[in-house]
Amino acid sequence: MSKLDTFIQHAVNAVPVSGTSLISSLYGDSLSHRGGEIWLGSLAALLEGLGFGERFVRTALFRLNKEGWLDVSRIGRRSFYSLSDKGLRLTRRAESKIYRAEQPAWDGKWLLLLSEGLDKSTLADVKKQLIWQGFGALAPSLMASPSQKLADVQTLLHEAGVADNVICFEAQIPLALSRAALRARVEECWHLTEQNAMYETFIQSFRPLVPLLKEAADELTPERAFHIQLLLIHFYRRVVLKDPLLPEELLPAHWAGHTARQLCINIYQRVAPAALAFVSEKGETSVGELPAPGSLYFQRFGGLNIEQEALCQFIR
């Protein structure tokens, strides 16, 4: 067995893999910029080499369709699954965090949200969405973020139907005498110790792959490249989507997120061309071949280090 196959199987078996989560990763990474639609049989072919059968795929697709994340259309005996409006919106929101090349710049301002008159259930749901967007809870009804744009937050509040129950404030960076207390509060409210530990686990899992990709370069087939890329993004996504992506000024020393991001970028850059080739080979839509990736694909991680024209030629 190839050393790359050994690594891939170890990654699959290390922790239980949710079908809905894995296929969400696949759609977001491999299909969202290629039309967002694929035949069920193509998905089964893409995942077969990882040990996931058609029943695994069908069950996950059924659940994602039931949740409104995927739409399904049937032509004859074939079923084609595509990202719904909801699925595409959530995918775009997630990829803005997943494929960042660096921490967000900060102008020293804070966005504060004070909720008024919300029942406990609604408040809990809104707080969950805001935390996913990078907010922290300074108090039961007070959320804060140093890096969110007001327009994005307003959209979220309107979608949740609570815009009239939330007061928005802007605050400047605190005086120097309160910065030590601020750092301690930030670490507590944003659970940075736990987040750092998750990044460390990701690094321990994927760092051994870096020398393997050099030692076994001739074994990096399109199928193996795709499997590596899917697992890489799947496990990185599970960590980075919980990261509030705080500005550099607020992070503790030796923040593992920096190393984890660069590790992900280095591996992704290495396997992306061949992975795209495999998706092109196996992927089929209701109108034939998958389209070439859109321009936004090539802006991932600050820009993939391969010319778009050359990559499109490679996958044909």
Swiss-Prot record:
Negative regulator of the paaZ and paaABCDEFGHIJK catabolic operons. Binds the consensus sequence 5'-WWTRTGATTCGYGWT-3'. Binding of PaaX is specifically inhibited by phenylacetyl-coenzyme A (PA-CoA). It holds the Pfam family PaaX_C. GO terms for biological process: DNA-templated transcription; negative regulation of DNA-templated transcription initiation; phenylacetate catabolic process. This is Transcriptional repressor PaaX. GO terms for molecular function: transcription cis-regulatory region binding. Belongs to the PaaX family. Signal peptide: none annotated. Pathway: Aromatic compound metabolism; phenylacetate degradation. Keywords: DNA-binding, Repressor, Transcription, Transcription regulation. The keyword Repressor applies.
